[in-house]
């Protein structure tokens, strides 16, 4: 089991945790979780020079969906199925680490999808949860709060981005995972009028930073690349 570290301040300049485990798909290997000044985490296999591909998953707030928080709505069900399909497609393209900013909408949905895959078919998949602050779920509905803590319990790694009370902590968490990512998967309706929400600002940040961004339309269920596409480098 991977140790999890929760921080409210910047991590040490360099901290490394090495351990060995047996994998069903590989011989014994060494998994290195490392933290540098950019708080970059990764996994390397012993004897290999293997690039780690990370995907940040972001999306508009639930109240901006036609169904709001009603996850039993057929539209929400279809969107979550398509989100799962896109996660698996990115996995096929070499992404092994998925990063979420722990919001109560797309971030939570994606985390539950990744944790489900890890438990059933893909134990080498990893989920990294970047919490905006330690009281993130305090005011959430009880059923969402329960799922939030289950998500954290099952994930690979937890990191707290900001102290409690930091302005725009959710946006800072979005920016953090985008900075760490090779590709962004964003559930977003580009036809909606622009707002100053953290989700919209995060989407704009991903595009402006030239990170390959795959936009999944929540109603049309179409997926289109904004800017360049994601092409994994071959070792």
What residues fall within each predicted segment?
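Acidic/glycine-enriched connector segments
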Residues: 45-234
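Short, positively charged and aromatic/hydrophobic N-terminal segments
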Residues: 19, 25-39
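Intrinsic disorder/low-complexity segments enriched in polar/small residues
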Residues: 14, 20-23, 42, 49
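Cationic, amphipathic, low-complexity segments that mediate targeting or membrane/lipid association
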Residues: 6-12, 17-18
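Residues at secondary-structure transition points
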Residues: 10-13, 36-37, 65
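Compositionally biased amphipathic helical and low-complexity segments enriched in hydrophobic
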Residues: 18-19, 25, 66, 217
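Detector for intrinsically disordered, low-structure N-terminal pre-sequences
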Residues: 6, 39-42
């Amino acid at each position: 089991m991977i140790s999890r570290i929760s921080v409210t301040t910047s991590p040490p300049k360099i901290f490394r945790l090495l351990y060995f485990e047996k994998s069903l798909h590989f011989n014994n290997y060494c998994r290195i979780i490392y933290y540098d000044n950019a708080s970059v985490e990764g996994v390397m296999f012993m004897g290999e020079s293997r690039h780690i591909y990370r995907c940040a998953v972001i999306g508009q707030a639930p109240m901006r969906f036609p169904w709001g928080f009603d996850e039993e709505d057929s539209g929400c069900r279809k969107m979550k199925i398509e989100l799962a399909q896109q996660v698996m497609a990115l996995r096929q393209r070499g992404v092994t680490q998925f990063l979420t900013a722990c919001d109560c909408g797309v971030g939570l949905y994606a985390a539950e999808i990744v944790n489900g895959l890890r438990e059933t078919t893909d134990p080498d998949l990893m989920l990294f949860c970047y919490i905006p602050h330690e009281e993130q779920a305090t005011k959430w509905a009880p059923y969402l709060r329960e799922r939030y803590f289950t998500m954290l319990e099952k994930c690979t790694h937890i990191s707290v981005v900001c102290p409690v009370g930091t302005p725009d902590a959710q946006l800072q968490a979005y920016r953090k995972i985008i900075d760490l990512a090779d590709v962004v998967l964003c559930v977003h309706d580009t036809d909606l009028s622009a707002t100053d929400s953290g989700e919209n600002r995060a989407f704009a940040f991903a595009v402006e930073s030239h990170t390959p961004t795959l936009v999944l339309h929540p109603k049309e269920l179409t997926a289109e690349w904004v800017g360049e596409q994601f092409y994994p480098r071959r070792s």
